[in-house]
From Swiss-Prot:
It is an enzyme of class 2 (transferase). GO terms for cellular component: membrane; polyphosphate kinase complex. This is Polyphosphate kinase. InterPro entries: PP_kinase (IPR003414), PP_kinase_C_1 (IPR041108), PP_kinase_middle (IPR024953), PP_kinase_middle_dom_sf (IPR036830), PPK_C_dom2 (IPR025200), PPK_N_dom (IPR025198), PPK_N_dom_sf (IPR036832). It comes from Bacillus cereus (strain ATCC 14579 / DSM 31 / CCUG 7414 / JCM 2152 / NBRC 15305 / NCIMB 9373 / NCTC 2599 / NRRL B-3711). Keywords: ATP-binding, Kinase, Magnesium, Metal-binding, Nucleotide-binding, Phosphoprotein, Transferase. One of its GO terms (molecular function) is polyphosphate kinase activity. It catalyses: [phosphate](n) + ATP = [phosphate](n+1) + ADP. Gene3D superfamilies: Endonuclease Chain A, Polyphosphate kinase middle domain, Polyphosphate kinase N-terminal domain.
Length: 702
């Protein structure tokens, strides 16, 4: 009878869903909690403040900008989950974002800065400087800063300039006593703080102390040198965040590379979506003018009590970390993979058995070696790879270029539409083409987000295929910071699937046949819907239905509704969702059998793992895809099964360890709010630290 009652519930009820944007802000709040956590090393807390700022910048440039575009276009339809119109979403975002930024500045000013001072790291303002320090700073300004600055006067002939996205600016009110008429005596000048100059200027100080002054403090103090003949009456600091969402019209685009290069130039000058103003020295006349010229409303304006643009704290972290090792995380070195010895040949090992890699606990080097060794191997005929985000000096790109120069058939899909990596990827696409690689840009109207490499080798007259599949990017830099899985196999069916997949990307093929791969936008959603339905059937028959799903974000309504159906049927569902989660757990007759946790800690949880008990058969899939509508419909994604029994047991044990985390885990309640998990055991379990310890133990055991 309970099930009938559950089925009578309307699963479209907006009370059962979290709004996507507000859920994302709740995730960024968890990032901010890491800055507030006194158990974290002090400089790491500084870095989390910077990450929070960087995340929020992108959120305004893309998500808030998109909602503002909808409002401007007169679109007022409520979104399909929580039922909020674009206008309501913007109102709620403004309230939450103002509150979070206030907490951020309070954390920085009243907790982190005083703690840094106790360590001998101190921010000084111009008024705090000694005579010797003032002389040093004036000379530094004259020689290093002044030649780079461009003072811009605002008058009838020189209108308010178009200021760069995310640039820090000084609005200077000037007084001209020589003017006869009072109304002509006040002038306005704008000075952009150059982003290429060092933001933190280290001052001469005694002993081991590190005292610094901010670049904008120095420029503000010497503004009179830029506007000679005028009296400086005020200097107001402000920063603009602009709409940076690219509009790419792929229909009829003969050269996508050129279209994207053209659009990238516009990104710097989009409409203002946020105005940040420094509270100290604020001039109300300047503020009124900024409102007018930028066309912003009260909810778009953030008056902050401290330095603007705290993303800059990352550069301070990098400057101080080598000098204050006790204030950063202890070094943890990725270990040789469990399935691959230190010096073993990755291809020969893959012929023996499948290889599972768990980064950053296990080294990313075998993935680099996989491509590099293929480039050097005279028996290798072809290398095919998808690239979404790569590092600035990528060893994988270098290996692909070498392979092409050696005459191998090298095909690289470079995703030009990877947000905020477009410029980088345009650069790599050109370099790869010049080296002789066959570069493709993917499928029209879809982002290729899948992570796959195929190596084709002819040995002793036989063709062999080796495949690497991953949950994360081919990026050796982020592989040290993101948790991800990689999988290397020589199984014939996987090789055939990889060949068919690349032919689909490069040719006019419709959906190919796959033995093991599921590919979005074709069938990943359908596959997971079927798997959940099977779990419901098994639960009704045997009472042992159990699903674990780990991902970055969960927003897809059909899949959320299917999970609600599983909960109503009694299936136990445990979700590890780091970021946005539109599903609400613990609602009677809807989701009381669902638990949602989020782990935010030292490493960014990035792996996508989907586990189905399947009456003891235990099906496990790894994927490049989160359970988001965009991943199901607008991206080329791959989901693949783990077939090896030992590997499945290992992945399940990792999932259970993450679910047992009682240090970095927050749990979502039925109202959509997150709380730290109450530690019910005597042992503190930080899953990320524990996984590193296990990797070290495996190395020692060998």
């Amino acid at each position: 009878m309970e099930l009938l009652k559950g089925n009578a519930v309307n699963l479209n009820d907006t009370a059962y869903y979290n709004n996507r944007e507000l859920s994302w802000l709740a995730f960024n709040e968890r990032v901010l909690q890491e800055a507030q956590d006194a158990n974290n090393p002090l400089l790491e807390r500084l870095k989390f403040i910077s990450i929070f700022s960087s995340n929020l910048d992108e959120f305004f440039m893309v998500r808030v900008a998109g909602l503002k575009d909808q409002v401007s276009a007169g679109f007022n339809q409520p979104e399909n989950k929580a039922g909020l119109t674009p206008k309501k979403q913007l109102n709620k975002i403004a309230i939450k974002a103002h509150a979070l930024m206030t907490v951020q500045y309070d954390t920085f000013k009243n907790y982190v800065l005083p703690a840094l001072e106790l360590e001998g790291i101190e921010r000084l303002t111009f008024n705090d400087l000694t005579k010797e320090q003032r002389e040093f700073i004036e000379e530094y300004f004259d020689e290093q800063i002044f030649p780079v600055l461009t003072p811009v006067a605002i008058d009838a002939y020189r209108p308010f300039p178009m200021l760069l996205n995310k640039s820090l600016n000084l609005a200077t009110l000037l007084y001209d006593e020589k003017q006869a008429e009072e109304e002509n005596r006040t002038k306005l000048g704008i000075v952009q703080v150059p982003s290429l100059l060092e933001r933190f200027i280290i001052l001469p100080s005694e002993g081991q102390k590190h005292k610094f002054i901010l670049l904008e403090d120095v420029i503000s103090s010497f503004t009179h040198k830029l506007f000679t003949g005028y009296t400086v009456s005020s200097v107001t600091r402000f920063r603009i965040t602009r709409n940076a969402d690219l509009t790419i019209h792929e229909e009829g685009a003969r050269d996508l590379l050129k279209v994207i290069e053209k659009e990238l130039k516009k990104r710097k000058w989009g409409a203002a979506v946020r105005l940040e103003v420094g509270k100290e020295h604020i001039d109300e006349r300047v503020l009124a003018l900024l409102y007018e010229v930028l066309e912003v409303k009260d909810e778009d304006v953030y008056i902050m009590d401290g330095p603007l643009d705290l993303t800059c704290l990352f550069s301070l972290y990098k400057k101080l970390a080598p000098l204050y090792e006790h204030l950063v995380y202890p070094a943890l070195i990725p270990q040789p993979p469990q399935d691959l010895g230190d010096e073993e040949d990755v291809f020969e090992k893959a012929i023996e058995h499948d290889i599972l890699l768990h980064h950053p606990f296990e080294s990313f080097q075998p993935v680099v070696d996989f491509v590099r060794d293929a480039a050097d191997d005279p028996n290798v005929l072809a290398i095919k790879q998808t690239l979404y985000r790569v590092s600035g000096d990528s060893p994988i790109i270098q290996a692909l270029k070498i392979a092409a120069e050696k005459g191998k058939q090298v095909t690289v899909l470079v995703e030009l539409k990877a947000r905020f990596d477009e410029e980088n990827n345009v650069h790599w696409a050109k370099e790869l083409e010049q080296a002789g690689c066959h570069v493709i840009y993917g499928v029209s109207h879809l982002k290729t987000h899948s992570k796959i490499t195929l190596v084709v080798r002819r040995k002793n007259g036989k063709i062999e295929r080796f495949v690497h599949l991953g949950t994360g990017n081919y990026n050796d830099a982020t592989a040290k910071l993101y948790t991800d899985f990689g999988y290397i196999t020589s199984r014939k069916d996987f090789g055939v699937d990889a060949t068919n997949f690349f032919n689909y990307l490069s040719g006019y093929t419709t959906k190919p046949h796959f033995h093991h791969l599921s590919v979005a936008p074709f069938d990943i959603r359908e596959q997971f819907m079927d798997l959940i339905d099977e779990e419901i059937r098994y639960h009704r028959q045997y009472g042992n239905g159990y699903i674990i799903a780990k991902m970055n974000s969960l927003t897809d309504k059909p899949l959320i509704k299917k999970m609600y159906e599983a909960s109503q049927a009694g299936v136990k569902v445990e979700l590890i969702v780091r970021g946005t989660c539109c599903l609400r757990p613990g609602i009677p007759n809807v989701s009381e059998n669902i638990r949602v946790v989020s782990v935010v800690g030292r490493y960014l949880e990035h792996s996508r793992i989907y586990y189905f008990h399947h009456n003891g058969e235990e099906k496990i899939y790894l994927s490049s895809a989160d359970l988001m509508t965009r991943n199901m419909e607008k991206r080329v994604e791959i989901s693949f099964p783990i077939l090896d029994i030992e590997m499945k047991a290992r992945i399940k044990a990792i999932l259970q360890l993450i679910l047992a985390d009682n240090v970095k885990t927050r749990e979502q309640n039925k109202d959509g709010d997150y709380y730290y998990v109450i530690n019910g055991s005597t042992e503190e379990i930080d899953s990320q630290v524990k996984l590193f310890k296990m990797a070290y133990q495996n190395t020692d055991a060998e």
